[in-house]
A protein has these predicted regions:
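Substrate-binding groove/exosite segments of carbohydrate-active enzymes
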Residues: 102-105, 174-239
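Polysaccharide-binding surfaces and accessory modules of carbohydrate-active proteins
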Residues: 2-92, 134-174, 178-179
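A conserved hydrophobic secondary-structure block that centers on an alpha-helix together
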Residues: 1-3, 104-105, 116
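Short beta-strand segments enriched in hydrophobic/aromatic residues
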Residues: 15, 127-129, 234
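Beta-strand-rich interaction surfaces with strong enrichment in secreted/lumenal proteins
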Residues: 96-100, 110-115
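Short Pro-Gly-centered flexible turn/kink motifs
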Residues: 7, 113-131
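A generic structural motif
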Residues: 1-4, 129-131, 236
Length: 239
């Protein structure tokens, strides 16, 4: 707050959940509007689509302080005929506490922050992935086990832990990307080759481990030819 008056800020941290499948996320099938499921706690929102039926993993969206409200239904948050430029709940400075079954799942935390003149505060939002043993998926019927989420959210509720994690991540990528550096005299070309191309090659390698001859990429993973190409892209990074 850089003014001389006390301020109250309504802060919304909001993101959309995927449906675990790139094809489902991109197609207009009625089935996609029937499967979404979420759970909610005071500081953590959970995405558990198809968890009961055939998954042992879930996603979560956490914040490191108490909230004034939350929502998991995109239609409720945006409003009738609404869009992301002016969500109806933001305009109303409120929350509906919507816990979705079907339709379009989101995670939205609503915080009210009081700032004295000259004061600043830091809020940490955490997007994560949790997994449970298949024989220990539920705490009770319909309620997922959340040990991974609770442990990770507690760890990174401390700003010092977040700073340390980002510093470690920076050192990790510096060690990988420093294996090769282009100095062309063209800043944009250097940035593309030295950072983004190498980063993309490394991520693609980590995600492409299938030895199939027929896979198409989006629907069933990566194919054998694609995986061979990935090898050439990262060999200079971790020879």
């Amino acid at each position: 707050n850089e003014t001389r008056e006390a301020k109250e800020v309504h802060l919304y941290g909001c993101m959309e959940w995927c449906l675990w499948n790139a094809v489902d996320d991109s197609t207009n099938y009625q089935r996609n509007l029937n499967i979404a499921e979420c759970e909610a706690e005071e500081r953590i929102l959970y995405h558990k689509t198809e968890y009961r039926e055939r998954r042992d993993h879930y996603a979560y969206y956490a914040v490191n302080r108490d909230t004034a409200g939350w929502d998991t239904d995109r239609n409720t948050f945006l409003g009738p005929m609404g869009d992301w430029s002016a969500p109806v709940l933001v305009e109303r400075e409120s929350s509906a506490f919507s816990c979705i079954t079907g339709w379009y799942p989101i995670g939205c935390h609503h915080l009210k922050i009081a700032l004295a003149p000259g004061e600043s505060q830091r809020v940490i939002f955490l997007l994560g992935y949790g997994k449970n043993p298949r024989d220990r998926k539920f705490l009770s019927p319909g309620v997922i086990r959340k040990d991974d989420a609770h442990t990770t959210a507690a760890k990174y509720a401390d700003p010092a832990a977040v700073d340390a994690a980002f510093a470690a991540l920076g050192r990790y990528w510096d060690s990988l990307l420093s294996s090769y550096q282009l100095r062309s005299g063209e800043e944009k070309l250097d940035r593309m080759v030295n950072i983004w191309h190498q980063y993309q090659c490394m991520v693609t390698f980590n995600l492409s481990r299938s030895a199939s001859y027929y896979e198409t990429g989006t629907g069933r993973g990566m194919g054998f030819r694609d995986s061979c190409q990935d090898l050439y892209g990262f060999m200079h990074i971790i020879p």
